[in-house]
A protein has these predicted regions:
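N-terminal, Lys/Arg-enriched amphipathic/low-complexity engagement segments
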Residues: 1-26, 36
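Tandem repeat scaffolds
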Residues: 184-210
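Terminal amphipathic alpha-helical/low-complexity segments used for targeting or macromolecular assembly
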Residues: 69-191
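Local cysteine-cluster metal-coordination motifs and their immediate loop/turn environment
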Residues: 18-35, 48-80, 106-113, 120
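Membrane-interface helix-loop junction between the first two transmembrane segments
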Residues: 37-44
Length: 210
């Protein structure tokens, strides 16, 4: 058996990437767009608060989202970007207190969500059974990405997110190839060993192997 994880899988790696709605300002309920054509019961524009969002940033129909047709809401994962934007980027200043920040905050949230998703996959890759060279590169880009998430709103908005994602995807591909190479090698070696064991006990002379 080959273990694809080289390092101990530490859940603490992902603590900051887990949803904590209590520390958020209902940003997913504001920033995201959805429509009836996508299976939702109503249309909602990006940057406009959902009609179900309450003044305390809680959902008034949270316990009946599925029944009311808001299935997408129950499946959405912001990877902890909501509380990051609320508590770190804007230091607790919400869009209800400062309506002029609503559009900017929504834009920052959508970018932050992408960055946090990248961090999730990078941290997943960092514990895989990969080469030390790739592991070092992944650790460096994790550090770089975390620094970006701590930047101010304007810097985050001006970030070349496509360029950064390209760098991340390249490393994730390298990590995947590294793991798959070891898995294929293990399977090949195991198969050969099993074939040798079988050959000692089976006489295939004259057998029809078509």
């Amino acid at each position: 058996m080959i273990d694809i994880h080289k390092n101990i899988y530490d859940n603490k790696l992902f603590e900051e990437l887990k949803i904590d709605c209590k520390k958020c300002f209902g940003l997913c309920c504001v920033a995201l767009y959805f429509s009836a054509s996508d299976g939702f019961p109503i249309d909602k524009e990006s940057g406009k608060p959902c009609i179900n969002l309450q003044p305390d940033f809680k959902c008034s129909v949270h316990n009946s989202l599925m029944k009311r047709g808001f299935k997408g809401c129950t499946a959405y994962d912001c990877f902890g970007s909501g509380q990051k934007v609320a508590q770190v980027t804007y230091k607790g200043i919400d869009w209800m207190q400062s309506p002029e920040l609503t559009n900017q905050m929504s834009e920052v949230f959508l970018i932050m969500r992408q960055l946090h998703e990248m961090l999730w996959y990078l941290k997943e890759a960092s514990v895989l059974n990969i080469s030390d060279t790739i592991k070092s590169k992944i650790d460096l880009i994790i550090e770089e990405t975390e620094k970006i998430t701590n930047m101010g709103p304007e810097q985050i908005i001006n970030l070349d997110i496509i360029s950064h994602r390209t760098k991340v995807n390249l490393l994730l591909s390298q990590a995947s190839e590294s793991v798959m190479g070891k898995v294929k090698s293990f399977i090949k070696t195991s198969t050969l060993k099993n074939m040798k064991k079988l050959s000692k006990n089976i006489d295939l002379i004259g057998a029809d192997l078509r």
